[in-house]
């Protein structure tokens, strides 16, 4: 039988084609899931941002203590008739806030503050529902990229924790002769809200680019800018917590002057705590200082100046980046910081008028997200060699 002669080079250029390089494990078969999960996270981001704004308005309208029970499920249904409204009003009239601050309030006036608090809680329920439907839906369809389900589950767990902290905060204003919630609990509640918002934003940024893009981009990360933005995250978070402490005791309304504080740099009685001797070694004195309007307002101003100064200094470093998108991110951050300074001064001079105060709170959200965006681009620069698919 004749045997066909074959060239020793026949397999080269003939037969099976060379395999085309593939993306990472997350990219393979999960492109649609990445887009879907990112859209779901963006919806959650908008809802959490709305939650922060509505929460701020609820506080500014003194509505947060109008609902004196925690009913996560049955509380979703508001009073539907006169008898139910009367029952809710009776519960509120047993609270110290009603007795000491709102005695004589009419049912119509109560309904106005009730709707603010009910809306705030209802928005929390909506967030929980959107998270659960999205997470369980992607999980059941097996469309969650490898390694991502713990991150997405953690968001839901933090959301549940936030609901519990919210009630823990409200409960602090229903005891004794309290007419407001404990400022430290308010700061805990708001701080966790920003942590959740930041985690959602970060995951959405990552999902906006393919895994192969991120792997290539990370090789060109700008370590100094990553470090600087990490510092900014820490200072910004401290400033957010201090802002909550100021809001919790209405400290902003006691010093409506700028750049001084009622004519002085250090406010009078800044270190005074009623009933506690001034002693640097006494923890009770330190905790008491958090209830001193002059002390917390001074710290909030100083932290604001620090954040603005660091942000503008870091902007100079950001402008030296060899990546255009990174430079643009630092430009946006610098402009937002300047705007936030103006809003902060406006909040002080207006004695925390609600319109200016809520704009200042929204400004904090914007700066928080822009710092994360700048850090993302410092860690994963957009470069011309990376194929399309970037955010």
From Swiss-Prot:
E.C. code: 1.17.99.9
Residues forming coiled coils: none
Membrane-topology descriptor: Multi-pass membrane protein
Residues the record lists as binding heme: 300, 360
GO molecular function: metal ion binding; oxidoreductase activity, acting on NAD(P)H, heme protein as acceptor
Catalytic activity from the UniProt record: Fe(II)-heme o + 2 A + H2O = Fe(II)-heme a + 2 AH2
Known pathway: Porphyrin-containing compound metabolism; heme A biosynthesis; heme A from heme O: step 1/1
Pfam families in UniProt: COX15-CtaA
Cofactor requirement: heme b
Similarity comment: Belongs to the COX15/CtaA family. Type 2 subfamily.
Biological role: Catalyzes the conversion of heme O to heme A by two successive hydroxylations of the methyl group at C8. The first hydroxylation forms heme I, the second hydroxylation results in an unstable dihydroxymethyl group, which spontaneously dehydrates, resulting in the formyl group of heme A.
Name of the protein in its database record: Heme A synthase
Species of the source: Cereibacter sphaeroides (strain ATCC 17029 / ATH 2.4.9) (Rhodobacter sphaeroides)
């Amino acid at each position: 039988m004749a045997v066909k002669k074959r060239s020793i080079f026949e397999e080269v250029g003939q037969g099976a084609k060379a395999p085309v390089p593939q993306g990472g494990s997350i990219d393979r078969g999960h492109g649609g899931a990445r887009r879907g999960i990112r859209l779901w996270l963006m919806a959650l981001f908008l809802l959490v941002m709305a939650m922060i704004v509505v929460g701020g308005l609820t506080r500014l309208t003194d509505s947060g203590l109008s609902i004196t029970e925690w009913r996560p499920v049955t509380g979703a249904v508001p009073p539907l008739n006169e008898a139910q409204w009367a029952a809710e009003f009776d519960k509120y009239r047993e609270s110290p806030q009603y007795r000491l601050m709102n005695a004589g309030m009419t049912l119509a006036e109560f309904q106005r503050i009730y709707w603010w608090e009910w809306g705030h809680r209802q928005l929390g329920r909506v967030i929980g529902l959107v998270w659960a439907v999205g997470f369980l839906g992607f999980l059941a369809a097996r469309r969650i990229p490898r390694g991502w389900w713990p991150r997405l589950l953690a968001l839901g767990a933090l959301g549940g924790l936030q609901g519990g902290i919210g009630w823990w905060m409200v409960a602090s204003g229903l005891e004794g002769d309290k007419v407001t919630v404990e400022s430290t609990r308010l700061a805990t509640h708001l701080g966790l809200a920003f942590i959740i918002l930041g985690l959602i934003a970060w995951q959405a940024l990552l999902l906006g680019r393919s895994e192969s893009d991120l792997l290539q981009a990370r090789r060109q990360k700008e370590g100094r800018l990553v470090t600087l933005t990490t510092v900014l995250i820490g200072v910004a978070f401290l400033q957010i917590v201090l802002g909550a402490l100021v809001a919790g005791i209405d400290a902003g309304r006691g010093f409506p002057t700028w750049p001084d504080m009622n004519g002085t740099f250090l406010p009078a009685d800044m270190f005074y705590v009623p009933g506690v001797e001034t002693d640097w070694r006494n923890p009770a004195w330190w905790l008491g200082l958090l209830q001193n309007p002059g002390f917390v307002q001074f710290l909030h101003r100083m932290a604001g100046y620090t954040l603005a100064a660091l942000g503008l200094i870091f902007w100079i470093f950001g402008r030296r980046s060899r990546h255009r998108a990174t430079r643009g991110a630092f430009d946006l951050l610098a402009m937002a910081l300047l705007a936030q300074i103006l809003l902060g001064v406006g909040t002080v001079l207006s004695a925390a008028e609600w319109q200016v105060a809520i704009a200042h709170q929204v400004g904090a959200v914007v700066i928080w997200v822009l710092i994360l965006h700048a850090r993302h681009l410092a860690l994963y620069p957009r470069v011309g060699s990376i194929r399309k698919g970037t955010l």
